[in-house]
Amino acid sequence: MNGRQRIHGTGRARIGIGLATALCAISWNASASEHPGQDWYRVNVRMSSQVVAPRGLLRDSQHAATVIFARIHVQLKWRGQNQQASKVVAGSMGEPATHDLAVEIVPHAPSPRNVALATAMPLADSGVRIVVFYDHVEPLLQGHHAPQATVMGYVLAHEIAHVLQGVARHSETGIMRANWTDGDFQLMGTRLLTFTPEDVQLIRRRLAPRDATAGCS
């Protein structure tokens, strides 16, 4: 391994964060700092798999991703392949809506030239929003000291965060780094690889009730 692992490609649904979005995130964060008590937001995730993975791997990776998001007060509720997640419903005043997304694990990447672990479609309105390429992920699971389910959980967390942020961007450090380093995988082993403050802002701002982000588009 060359010390860096590309998380996903750059060819699908790529947009930059405009000045208005950045200013809105700053404004929302300033408001949040005045109210340190954080609300919990719920996200329903329906995951289906076309691969035969080691026993317990997918279940334990879901748990790992759940723990990662719980640290930023986002609750992931996992649904099986045949379980339909509830539809998005508007919360009452001061309560967030429930957000749904779907993850599919497929045996192979669509092209030999595609070296990404997965792809996320943050701008899609419905359907499968995340596709994980198991032939790319499997060697990664066996190449580091971190437990396999933990690494898989971080892959899921990275892609879910893209969808929740609603933009195709990466951070210079942390979970949302475009290319994970050996140091990142060591941090995964101790569950110390985290989202950056900006990543948390973007995720929670989009999950917050609309009245909490009035004026942001």
Identify the function of each model-found stretch.
Residues 33-37, 46-47, 51-63, 120-146, ...:
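Metalloprotease/metallohydrolase-associated module, dominated by Zn2+-dependent proteases
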Residues 14-27:
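Bacterial N-terminal signal peptides
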